[in-house]
Amino acid sequence: MAPRLGIFLLWAGVSVFLPLDPVNGDQHLPGRFLTPAITSDDKCVFPFIYKGNLYFDCTLHDSTYYWCSVTTYYMKRWRYCRSTDYARCALPFIFRGKEYDSCIKEGSVFSKYWCPVTPNYDQDRAWRYC
């Protein structure tokens, strides 16, 4: 009885951790057993459109890890984001009709420095904290 139980436990353990299906960028990735990996050397394209939404930065939409499209219109070509991929401040920029050349606190609910990721915040309203 003990050898059979040992073989069963070994089989059950291997079955849990064995990847059974290939994964591509069009699927929702279960984050429990996967770690982020770069899928290609292509660069992120910002802004990009995914499922009708415009993204100016890496996103968690339909994923456990931040990712980006490598085409302007998402066509199942994507990769996980690296630290160098996230949106950068667009300096100088326009906010409430005035031009700025550095991060500002003006307009911040939490009094934190921020900047837009496009040259005209008034038009695009895409921003990030500095």
Swiss-Prot record:
Keywords: Disulfide bond, Fertilization, Repeat, Secreted, Signal. Component of seminal plasma. Residues 39-83, 84-130 form the Fibronectin type-II domain. It holds the Pfam family fn2. It is found in: Secreted. The keyword Secreted applies. Disulfide bonds join 44-68, 58-81, 89-115, 103-130. Gene3D superfamilies: Fibronectin, type II, collagen-binding. This is Seminal plasma protein pB1. It comes from Sus scrofa.
